[in-house]
């Protein structure tokens, strides 16, 4: 933040000096003013550190950040900002302007640059020359068509979007996949048959790739021209052609020069590592291959968000993103396929009632009976709902005569009066909890998927009567708590009335399909997967994951680095880990 402010102030200082003198800024004056500005900045920083002013500034940072953002965005540099650059007189020399502007073409920030660097360090200089050469020629040809306004080529090519982008992804995929299986041996000859493919692929990708940095830096130029594509307009056609050809020649010469510079720099870095470290050549080659492979793959995927695929598919049909005509279709973020139909005979309506609120168009932290928006602290749905349904996760030890179970029940707020599980008095006894306990006592260890229809036919009438009596007692004796009732009525038991047999059946069905078993009587156990049953299959799956470079890299970054940075006092002992596991099961 302070760096942006210093740069803006420095530009204003140079602009003020230029306006005051009325003449082009001389080189000596530029250096003296720059040194004076740097000394003033250093003096200000030292005074702030010694006077402890930085403590006050840090405390006021939440207030200052919006004001700083507004000042940076709101204050545009004056017109004289572009005048002092004319001291170099680059605007009159298109060759030098093109040469310097080509530095942005050679920045190694695109997928093709990473692939070419990989070929340089693994397969040698000839392979890198052909790779970089095809990319540079493709860029220069594209820029020439833009500068000269060759509409017969540019307009039809751009109207093919996104087909040309998809073609670029296909070409990049072929190159990246081939990198995975290519030999890392150095190619010393200049007439290898692979070089032709290297050149052609890079030439085509220069017209298709969207991951290069120069598209997004087109307004950065060392000359007075507003963009890198700004031409040199003259009334004389011959002079105009000469200037444009000179500018393109400067682009070509600069691209080759800066590319050779980057190649020389990477080769020097490789030589330095070989001489001054204990790494062998094959280790460096393997590391470079992995880094370039991941970088090229990352940049290729990074271009995907620039295209909305739902719009690409329905755009030609006349639709727009977030169109109401696309609601409840596969093109909406809230689309969900219908659930299984095995239990649909119990209900007239679908049993899966899921509320999906996509983050781009949902309303959050509200519920139907209130209009004002509540804070996150007031609506902790997950924790509150887990506390409401905690009775379903009790094990037999909690409800039996075991000493540990009684202590745990007392700590959680349950006071056991009798030996029966159904006679527990809950801290907040509600209609839903009573009904769940009633079902729990009847269907403890039965698989509801096979027997729920027969059970409902025989027990529904008595259950409805008992629940109605319990409901009247609940409404008459207990206080109303909207915070907890919100979960019964809005999330889990919405529009449920115990006076209607049809809705009672819906209630039982919706309650029973929430888990694999109806109200399990033990702690949540770790599910057995295929790898635990068949050890050979599990070992093979683990080996496949461990062979994946992306998986191992993410695992190292996410877990190993995090644990390595933790202080020793933050590590858990054996007793603490055991206690944490018990609390998680609760």
Curated annotation (Swiss-Prot):
Keywords on record: Membrane, Plastid, Transmembrane, Transmembrane helix
What residue ranges are annotated as transmembrane? Answer: 95-115, 129-151, 155-177, 198-217, 247-267, 284-304
> Quick one: where is this thing mainly located?
plastid
Naming one, the record's GO cellular component terms include: plastid membrane
Q: Does the keyword Membrane apply?
A: yes
Q: Where in the cell is it found?
A: Plastid membrane
Q: Where is the signal peptide?
A: none
On whether Cytoplasm is a keyword of this UniProt record, the answer is no
This protein's source sits in the domain of life called Eukaryota
Q: How would you describe this protein's topology in the membrane?
A: Multi-pass membrane protein
Name of the molecule in the record: Uncharacterized membrane protein ycf78
Source organism of the structure:
Prototheca wickerhamii
């Amino acid at each position: 933040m302070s760096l942006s402010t210093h740069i803006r102030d420095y530009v204003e200082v140079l602009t003020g000096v230029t306006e005051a003198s009325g003449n082009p800024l001389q080189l000596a004056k530029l250096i003296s003013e720059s040194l004076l500005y740097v000394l003033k900045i250093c003096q200000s920083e030292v005074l702030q550190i010694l006077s402890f002013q930085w403590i006050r500034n840090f405390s006021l940072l939440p207030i200052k950040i919006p004001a700083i953002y507004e000042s940076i965005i709101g204050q545009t540099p004056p017109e004289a900002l572009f005048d002092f650059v004319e001291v170099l007189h680059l605007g009159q020399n298109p060759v030098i302007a093109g040469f310097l502007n080509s530095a942005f073409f050679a920045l190694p920030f695109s997928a093709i640059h990473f692939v070419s660097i990989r070929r340089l360090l693994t397969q040698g200089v000839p392979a890198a020359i052909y790779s970089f050469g095809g990319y540079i020629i493709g860029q220069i040809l594209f820029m020439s068509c833009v500068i000269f306004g060759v509409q017969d080529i540019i307009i039809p090519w751009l109207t093919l979007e996104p087909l040309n982008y998809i073609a670029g992804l296909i070409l990049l995929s072929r190159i990246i996949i081939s990198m995975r299986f290519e030999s890392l041996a150095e190619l010393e000859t200049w007439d290898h048959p692979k070089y032709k493919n290297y050149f052609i692929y890079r030439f085509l990708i220069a017209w298709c790739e969207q991951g290069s940095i120069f598209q997004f830096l087109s307004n950065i130029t060392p000359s007075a021209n507003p963009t890198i594509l700004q031409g040199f307009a003259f009334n004389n056609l011959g002079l105009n052609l000469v200037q444009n050809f000179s500018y393109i020649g400067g682009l070509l010469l600069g691209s080759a020069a800066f590319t050779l510079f980057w190649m020389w720099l990477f080769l020097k870095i490789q030589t330095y590592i070989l001489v001054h470290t204990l790494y062998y050549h094959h280790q460096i080659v393997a590391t470079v291959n992995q880094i370039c492979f991941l970088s090229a793959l990352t940049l290729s995927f990074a271009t995907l968000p620039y295209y909305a695929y739902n719009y690409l598919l329905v755009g030609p049909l006349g639709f727009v993103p977030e169109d109401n005509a696309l609601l409840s279709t596969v093109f909406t973020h809230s689309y969900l396929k219908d659930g299984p139909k095995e239990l649909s005979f119990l209900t007239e309506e679908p049993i899966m009632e899921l509320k999906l609120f996509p983050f781009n168009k949902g309303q959050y932290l509200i519920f139907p009976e209130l209009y004002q928006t509540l804070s996150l602290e007031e609506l902790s749905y997950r924790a509150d709902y887990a506390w409401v349904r905690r009775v379903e996760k009790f094990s037999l030890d909690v409800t039996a005569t075991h000493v540990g179970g009684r202590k745990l029940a007392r700590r959680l707020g349950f006071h056991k009066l009798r030996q029966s599980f159904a006679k527990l008095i809950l801290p907040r006894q509600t209609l839903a909890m009573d009904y769940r306990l009633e079902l729990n006592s009847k269907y403890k260890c039965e698989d509801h998927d096979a027997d729920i229809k027969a059970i409902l036919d025989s027990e529904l009438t008595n259950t409805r009567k008992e629940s109605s009596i319990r409901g009247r007692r609940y409404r008459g004796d207990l206080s109303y708590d909207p915070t907890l009732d919100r979960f019964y009525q809005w999330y889990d038991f919405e529009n449920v009335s115990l006076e209607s047999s049809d809705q009672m059946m819906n209630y039982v069905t919706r309650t029973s399909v929430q888990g694999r078993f109806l109200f399990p009587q033990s702690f949540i156990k770790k599910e057995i997967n295929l790898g635990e049953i068949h050890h050979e299959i599990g070992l093979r799956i683990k080996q496949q994951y461990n062979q994946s470079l992306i998986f191992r890299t993410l695992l190292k970054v996410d877990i190993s680095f995090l644990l390595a940075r933790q202080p020793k006092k933050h590590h858990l002992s054996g007793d603490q880990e055991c206690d944490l596991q018990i609390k998680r099961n609760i």
